[in-house]
């Protein structure tokens, strides 16, 4: 079984929205062994929808459509499918009950103008919408299209995702004879080309059916090890062997396999070793604290964060010496060190991380260009003294990109420091 995804909506073609629905659907289908061979974005024009769906149904077993099921005039997907398949609609009692309940739960009456949201194309299987109002459906398209299946879902991500999890994936699971396994390998502190050179031998020795994809992004490089085959046990074995080989070769740069984030990894290391952390931020403006506290359970290890953006704030809130600021400038390792010391002593945490830099687009100089970042790490030692580590880094990007990269670098330095303090830990998956 192979699939195509058709995303309907003028906003996708005008750049108004990013098509996150397609990536979610593709990943979900991959999990049940259904590869996606094409993703198409289509306007709200009824004739265009018919043309695109006719082409997709003629070359694949399964077409999943998002968008165009709402109650407004520009929602034309249902009408287009009715014309394409030459079928009418019927009211679904179950869909109508869910729609009425949705309005009742909000203290409202169901408007007559929205009853159409409870209609489905004849011969289709209802895909209930427990989050919104538009009913989804699974349609067998008959011999004209080789008995291919068509799935219609709303374009609202939360509604589509709920439908995929509860109805669509269970419906098609087991219909594919192909086993597919994708394993993300998360790296930090190494570039794409350097990583490729490091694991060249492992890539040359990939078993049949296994591929390796490099996905560079703002903060680092993710690898995705993908294995395809007919026997699930063999697919899992081959995939695991490749992942283990990469871990053995490049483990010092790998913080997780799977969907674990760097902040989750740092948090797990802190929690498992009964350690606490505090942060002092300038250029990241609270982003580092935000990422650390995005992790559920972070109250067990996160003590506090101080945003000391101005020089006066660095002096007043953290005790940074004015002479240090005057001698080295705010963006310097000596200031980063004093910021880390200040928040460590004031918070009572075991570890402190500081950031001071130039996010841009202005404010740079010849020796400190835009994208310069200084990080300070301070950690309590068993004898009561404080160990320090500082570093200067150079980034390139927009202000928003630099702030994101600065926070990632700070988390990376915290991760590296923790590995030295508590020893290498099992890679999170």
Curated annotation (Swiss-Prot):
This is CinA-like protein. Coiled coil: none annotated. It comes from Chlorobium limicola (strain DSM 245 / NBRC 103803 / 6330). It comes from the Bacteria. Belongs to the CinA family. Pfam families: CinA, CinA_KH, MoCF_biosynth. InterPro entries: CinA, CinA-like_C, CinA_C, CinA_KH, Competence-induced_CinA, MoaB/Mog-like_dom_sf, MoaB/Mog_dom.
């Amino acid at each position: 079984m192979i699939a195509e995804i058709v995303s309907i909506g003028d906003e996708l073609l005008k750049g108004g929205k990013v098509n996150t629905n397609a990536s979610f659907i593709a990943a979900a289908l991959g999990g049940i062994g259904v590869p996606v061979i094409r993703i198409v974005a289509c306007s709200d024009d009824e004739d265009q929808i018919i043309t695109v769906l006719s082409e997709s149904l003629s070359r694949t077993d399964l077409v999943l459509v998002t968008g165009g099921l709402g109650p407004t005039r520009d929602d034309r997907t249902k009408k287009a499918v009715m014309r394409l398949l030459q079928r009418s609609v019927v009211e679904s009692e179950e869909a109508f009950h869910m729609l009425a309940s949705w309005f009742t739960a909000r203290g409202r009456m169901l408007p007559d103008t929205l009853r159409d949201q409870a209609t489905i194309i004849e011969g289709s299987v209802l895909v209930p919408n427990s989050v919104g109002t538009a009913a989804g459906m699974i349609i067998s398209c008959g011999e004209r299209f080789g008995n291919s299946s068509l799935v219609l879902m709303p374009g609202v991500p939360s509604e589509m995702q709920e439908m995929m999890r509860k109805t669509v994936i269970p419906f098609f699971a087991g219909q594919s004879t192909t086993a597919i396994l994708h394993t993300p390998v998360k790296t930090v502190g190494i570039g794409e080309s350097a990583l490729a050179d490091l694991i060249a031998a492992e890539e040359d020795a990939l078993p049949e059916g296994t591929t390796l994809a490099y996905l560079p992004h703002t903060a680092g490089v993710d690898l995705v090890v993908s294995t395809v085959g007919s026997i699930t046990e063999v697919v899992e074995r081959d995939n695991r062997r490749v992942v283990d080989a990469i871990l053995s070769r490049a483990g010092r740069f790998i913080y997780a396999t799977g969907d674990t984030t760097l902040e989750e990894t740092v948090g797990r290391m802190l929690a498992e070793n009964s350690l606490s952390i505090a942060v002092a931020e300038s250029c990241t403006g609270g982003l580092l604290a935000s990422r650390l506290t995005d992790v559920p359970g972070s109250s067990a290890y996160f003590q506090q964060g101080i945003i000391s953006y101005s020089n006066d704030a660095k002096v007043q809130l953290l005790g940074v010496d004015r002479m240090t600021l005057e001698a080295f400038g705010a963006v310097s390792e000596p200031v980063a060190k004093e910021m880390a010391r200040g928040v460590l002593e004031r918070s009572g945490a075991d570890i402190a991380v500081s950031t001071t830099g130039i996010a841009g687009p202005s404010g740079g100089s010849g020796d400190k260009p835009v994208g310069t970042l200084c990080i300070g790490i301070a950690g309590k030692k068993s004898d009561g003294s404080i160990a320090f580590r500082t570093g200067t880094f150079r980034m390139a990007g927009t202000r928003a990109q630099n702030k994101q990269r600065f926070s990632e670098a700070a988390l990376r330095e915290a991760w590296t420091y923790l590995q030295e303090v508590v020893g290498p830990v099992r890679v999170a998956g």
